[in-house]
């Protein structure tokens, strides 16, 4: 005989699901009268990775910029940890950006500062750490991305892949709950893309943050995604688990998958991120 569940156990079973950390609901935005995103909805639960896929110009990066508060939607709701951000002032968004950060395509590193000083910059801006604590955290972050050998060099001497790894370290200095990545594999070869994917996945598992990754690289997305949002002509053609996306018979999705140039993991080898892209 099985024991009957207690009232407490039943309450836990029937409880409302956890509120998504990101809730992007019926969002539309147009530039100069041209629709960029139309009625797009998705959500991400804490600890998940969402990959936003689609061809160039479909509004993938625009979605990230709205999550950061750099752009305001014309219609719809954007909530981060239950807080509506579309009506916040710039001061209110600065508070939100302590919990959500973005790794830009170009890395947005300071060319005049060494790798160490780039990573230290946001830590010093916090204002609650002494210099010894700053340097301890810098060493830890640089170690997490495997950049110990380039701490004293300027970003201009780094490969594209190494710049992106350093940019990730700097983004993590804010101890964010959500990390947004804008096309992290653009202008890198498949080997470096693989290692960037491994790095992002390893950091997520170690630190537990939520990730949203914009990419057109399906092989990269397969390594990372719990959820997929596929955009076509500014509309959400698919939102759901990776497995469902791969099995979809939607003609636009099948065309996207057919056009993607796959490189099998077995072909990539084990080249480190120090390889110049």
Model-derived segments and their meaning:
Residues 68:
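Helix-to-loop junction immediately C-terminal to a conserved catalytic motif
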Residues 83-84, 131-149:
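Conserved ABC ATPase "signature" region
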Residues 113-121:
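Short coil-to-helix segment of the ABC ATPase nucleotide-binding domain corresponding to the Q-loop/switch region
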Residues 154-158, 162:
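Conserved ABC ATPase signature
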Residues 175:
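Conserved catalytic motifs of ABC-family nucleotide-binding domains
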Residues 179-182:
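Catalytic Walker B motif of ABC-type/P-loop ATPase nucleotide-binding domains
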């Amino acid at each position: 005989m099985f024991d009957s569940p207690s009232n407490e156990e039943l309450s836990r079973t029937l409880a409302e699901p956890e509120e998504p950390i990101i809730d992007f609901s019926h969002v539309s935005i147009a530039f100069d009268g041209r629709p960029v995103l139309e009625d797009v909805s998705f959500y991400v639960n804490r600890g998940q990775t969402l990959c936003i896929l689609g061809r160039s110009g479909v509004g993938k990066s625009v979605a990230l910029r709205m999550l950061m508060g750099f752009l305001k939607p014309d219609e719809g709701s954007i909530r981060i940890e239950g807080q509506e951000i579309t009506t916040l002032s710039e001061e209110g968004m600065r508070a939100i950006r302590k919990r959500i950060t973005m790794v830009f395509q170009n890395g947005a590193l300071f060319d005049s500062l060494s790798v160490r000083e780039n990573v230290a910059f946001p830590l010093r801006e916090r204002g609650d750490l002494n210099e010894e604590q700053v340097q301890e955290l810098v060493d830890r972050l640089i170690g997490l991305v495997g950049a110990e050998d380039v701490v004293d060099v300027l970003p201009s001497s780094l490969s594209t892949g190494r710049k992106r790894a350093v940019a990730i370290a700097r983004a993590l200095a804010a101890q964010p709950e959500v990390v947004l990545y804008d096309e992290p594999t653009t202008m890198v070869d498949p080997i470096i893309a693989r290692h960037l994917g491994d790095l992002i996945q390893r950091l997520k598992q170690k630190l537990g943050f939520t990730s949203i990754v914009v990419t057109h690289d399906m092989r990269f997305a397969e390594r990372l995604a719990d959820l997929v949002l596929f955009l076509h002509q500014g509309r959400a053609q698919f939102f759901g688990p990776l497995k469902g996306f791969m099995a979809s018979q939607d003609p636009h999705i099948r065309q996207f998958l057919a056009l993607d140039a796959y490189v099998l993991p077995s072909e990539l080898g084990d080249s480190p991120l120090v390889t110049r892209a």
